[in-house]
Amino acid sequence: MIDSPRVCIQVQSVYVESQSIPEEERYVFAYTITIRNLGRFNVQLLGRYWLITNSNGRQTEVQGEGVVGEQPLIPPGGEFQYTSGAILETPLGTMEGHYEMVDHQGQPFQTAIPVFRLAIPTLIH
Protein backbone atom coordinates (compact mmCIF):
# COMPACT_ATOMS: atom_id res chain seq x y z
CA MET A 1 0.00 0.00 0.00
CA ILE A 2 1.34 3.48 -0.88
CA ASP A 3 0.02 6.73 0.53
CA SER A 4 0.10 10.11 -1.20
CA PRO A 5 -0.67 13.18 0.91
CA ARG A 6 -4.43 12.57 0.50
CA VAL A 7 -5.05 9.24 -1.18
CA CYS A 8 -4.32 5.58 -0.41
CA ILE A 9 -4.27 2.91 -3.14
CA GLN A 10 -4.78 -0.81 -2.48
CA VAL A 11 -4.55 -3.47 -5.22
CA GLN A 12 -5.48 -7.15 -5.47
CA SER A 13 -4.92 -9.23 -8.61
CA VAL A 14 -6.12 -12.67 -9.72
CA TYR A 15 -5.48 -14.97 -12.66
CA VAL A 16 -8.56 -15.56 -14.82
CA GLU A 17 -7.98 -19.12 -15.98
CA SER A 18 -11.35 -19.40 -17.77
CA GLN A 19 -10.39 -16.63 -20.23
CA SER A 20 -6.73 -17.57 -20.62
CA ILE A 21 -5.25 -19.67 -23.43
CA PRO A 22 -1.67 -20.51 -22.39
CA GLU A 23 -0.88 -22.43 -25.60
CA GLU A 24 -1.59 -19.17 -27.48
CA GLU A 25 0.41 -17.09 -24.98
CA ARG A 26 -2.73 -15.42 -23.64
CA TYR A 27 -2.82 -14.97 -19.87
CA VAL A 28 -5.74 -12.94 -18.52
CA PHE A 29 -5.62 -11.21 -15.15
CA ALA A 30 -8.17 -9.17 -13.23
CA TYR A 31 -7.24 -6.57 -10.66
CA THR A 32 -9.36 -4.75 -8.12
CA ILE A 33 -8.26 -1.34 -6.94
CA THR A 34 -9.55 0.54 -3.93
CA ILE A 35 -8.87 4.29 -3.85
CA ARG A 36 -9.39 5.87 -0.43
CA ASN A 37 -9.54 9.61 0.22
CA LEU A 38 -7.80 10.16 3.56
CA GLY A 39 -7.99 13.94 3.29
CA ARG A 40 -10.48 16.53 4.49
CA PHE A 41 -11.71 17.57 1.03
CA ASN A 42 -13.08 15.96 -2.13
CA VAL A 43 -10.66 14.62 -4.73
CA GLN A 44 -11.46 13.57 -8.29
CA LEU A 45 -9.73 11.01 -10.47
CA LEU A 46 -9.37 12.31 -14.03
CA GLY A 47 -6.98 9.89 -15.70
CA ARG A 48 -4.60 6.98 -15.39
CA TYR A 49 -1.18 5.85 -16.57
CA TRP A 50 -0.04 2.21 -16.50
CA LEU A 51 3.30 0.59 -17.19
CA ILE A 52 2.72 -3.12 -17.79
CA THR A 53 5.79 -5.38 -17.94
CA ASN A 54 5.75 -9.07 -18.86
CA SER A 55 8.38 -11.58 -17.73
CA ASN A 56 10.26 -11.19 -21.04
CA GLY A 57 10.81 -7.51 -20.19
CA ARG A 58 8.36 -6.25 -22.81
CA GLN A 59 6.70 -3.06 -21.59
CA THR A 60 3.40 -1.53 -22.62
CA GLU A 61 2.25 1.93 -21.60
CA VAL A 62 -1.46 2.69 -21.27
CA GLN A 63 -2.92 6.15 -20.68
CA GLY A 64 -6.49 7.29 -20.64
CA GLU A 65 -9.25 9.29 -19.08
CA GLY A 66 -10.85 8.03 -15.88
CA VAL A 67 -11.19 4.38 -14.94
CA VAL A 68 -13.83 1.94 -16.23
CA GLY A 69 -15.60 4.85 -17.94
CA GLU A 70 -15.80 7.00 -14.81
CA GLN A 71 -14.05 10.01 -13.34
CA PRO A 72 -15.11 9.47 -9.74
CA LEU A 73 -15.40 12.24 -7.17
CA ILE A 74 -14.28 10.76 -3.86
CA PRO A 75 -15.46 12.52 -0.68
CA PRO A 76 -13.38 12.83 2.50
CA GLY A 77 -13.18 9.44 4.18
CA GLY A 78 -14.75 7.84 1.11
CA GLU A 79 -13.51 5.25 -1.31
CA PHE A 80 -13.97 4.15 -4.90
CA GLN A 81 -13.40 0.56 -5.96
CA TYR A 82 -13.27 -0.91 -9.45
CA THR A 83 -12.16 -4.05 -11.23
CA SER A 84 -10.43 -4.16 -14.60
CA GLY A 85 -8.14 -6.50 -16.47
CA ALA A 86 -4.92 -7.03 -18.36
CA ILE A 87 -3.78 -9.60 -20.90
CA LEU A 88 -0.15 -10.72 -20.96
CA GLU A 89 1.82 -12.96 -23.31
CA THR A 90 3.61 -14.52 -20.33
CA PRO A 91 2.37 -16.15 -17.10
CA LEU A 92 4.11 -13.54 -14.98
CA GLY A 93 4.30 -9.76 -15.10
CA THR A 94 3.86 -6.53 -13.18
CA MET A 95 1.80 -3.38 -13.37
CA GLU A 96 2.44 0.04 -11.85
CA GLY A 97 1.54 3.61 -12.62
CA HIS A 98 -0.29 6.63 -11.32
CA TYR A 99 -3.62 8.41 -11.30
CA GLU A 100 -4.03 11.99 -12.46
CA MET A 101 -6.25 13.68 -9.89
CA VAL A 102 -7.43 17.12 -8.85
CA ASP A 103 -8.10 18.42 -5.37
CA HIS A 104 -11.12 20.45 -4.24
CA GLN A 105 -9.50 23.63 -5.60
CA GLY A 106 -8.88 22.11 -9.02
CA GLN A 107 -5.14 21.72 -8.42
CA PRO A 108 -3.75 18.67 -10.22
CA PHE A 109 -1.70 16.01 -8.45
CA GLN A 110 -0.57 12.46 -9.10
CA THR A 111 -1.16 9.46 -6.87
CA ALA A 112 1.22 6.53 -7.35
CA ILE A 113 -0.18 3.07 -7.99
CA PRO A 114 2.20 0.62 -6.31
CA VAL A 115 3.81 -2.08 -8.41
CA PHE A 116 1.89 -5.33 -8.19
CA ARG A 117 2.40 -8.80 -9.59
CA LEU A 118 0.31 -10.59 -12.18
CA ALA A 119 1.05 -14.30 -11.89
CA ILE A 120 -0.62 -17.63 -12.46
CA PRO A 121 -1.07 -19.43 -9.11
CA THR A 122 1.47 -22.17 -9.86
CA LEU A 123 4.23 -19.54 -10.05
CA ILE A 124 3.56 -18.10 -6.60
CA HIS A 125 5.51 -19.79 -3.84
Curated annotation (Swiss-Prot):
Give the domain of life: Bacteria
InterPro entries attached to this UniProt entry: ApaG_domain, ApaG_sf, Uncharacterised_ApaG
Name a Pfam family for this protein. DUF525
**What processes in GO biological process is this protein linked to?**
error-free translesion synthesis
Domain ApaG span(s) in chain numbering: 1-125
HAMAP family the UniProt entry points to: ApaG
- In Swiss-Prot or TrEMBL terms, this protein is called Protein ApaG
UniProt organism field: Serratia proteamaculans (strain 568)
